[in-house]
Amino acid sequence: MTRTTTTRKANGGGDTVKYSIIVPTYNEQLNIAMLLALIVEAMEEGTKRKEGRKIPPSSSPSYEVIVVDDNSQDQTQQTIQKLQKIEKYRDILRLKPRKGKLGLGSAYIHGLQFARGEFVILMDADLSHNPKAIPEFIRKQEEGDYDVVTGTRYLASSSSSSSSTTTTTTISSRIMNNSSSTKSSRKSKIKEQECGVYGWDTRRKLTSRVANYLAHVLLNPGVSDLTGSFRLYRKTTFQALVSSMQSVGYVFQMEIIVRAKRGGFKVAEVPISFVDRVYGSSKLGASEIIGYLKGLVSLFMRV
């Protein structure tokens, strides 16, 4: 059986898949093709090694990529539709658009409606999250039969929460082949980094640290990175958690992990590298920061 045949059998039609990767997008035309290529590479190559031994292609996990697009004003949807016509993407790539920007949390919930996997993986579309880390999330989940595995930018790789690190080398080198921008040049200097944030200026790093610190003081979540969005959930766990959720924006990430910990679900962390986007602009502005602070206080009062 060829790899193509195996993939189609696992991912096509109404068959159940093991992993549903949900990717919200808004104006990600320049990133989505690269992201998809890296996801496929990670799933087909990274998961072929278990305990240092290669495993046959037929043992690679079945998966799908669900893109939830919030009515992008560029060619994001058209790019995805073109990618769906490519044979290796045809059976794994699914586009589930919405009419407008309705919040990051609600985008995940929208994608969940279409997820066929036993597990759901949430990640950003702007290449800030390295798909090469996905096999580490999978390995960690299998290692302890965890309900949630969350990526952390703030946990040393020597921590007992995980024995692995991820790199940004692949993304950096590939982007360098397509861009000569200052940001791209900065990314090319990153070599085998462990967990952390790269490419942000001091103000952005400070904002993130303060936001995470405030969240820890008010919520005592029991994880090192409360605001990160690169996560793996058992689908039944995710469904149970979102059924009681009230947040739909960036606060969604905090509320769901707090509810998971307080609800007795098994949660683990995996160190990740977070790299600033090269193409497009950040969705985080003053209104999002104000919304975050309001949401944090609201979350403190009701959770």
Task: Map each language-model feature to its residues.
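A conserved hydrophobic helix/loop-capping motif in glycosyltransferases and polysaccharide synthases
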Residues: 19-28, 35, 42
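Acidic helix N-cap motif at the loop->helix transition within catalytic regions
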Residues: 30-34, 74-83
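Cell-envelope/extracellular polymer assembly enzymes that use nucleotide-activated donors
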Residues: 18-20, 64, 255
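Short beta-strand/loop segment that forms part of the nucleotide-sugar
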Residues: 23, 36, 48-72, 96-97
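Acceptor/aglycone-binding surface of glycosyltransferases and processive sugar-polymer synthases
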Residues: 98-114, 119, 131-250, 277-287, ...
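A conserved acidic beta->alpha catalytic loop
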Residues: 69-78, 127
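Conserved donor nucleotide-binding strand/loop of the catalytic core
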Residues: 62-66, 77-114
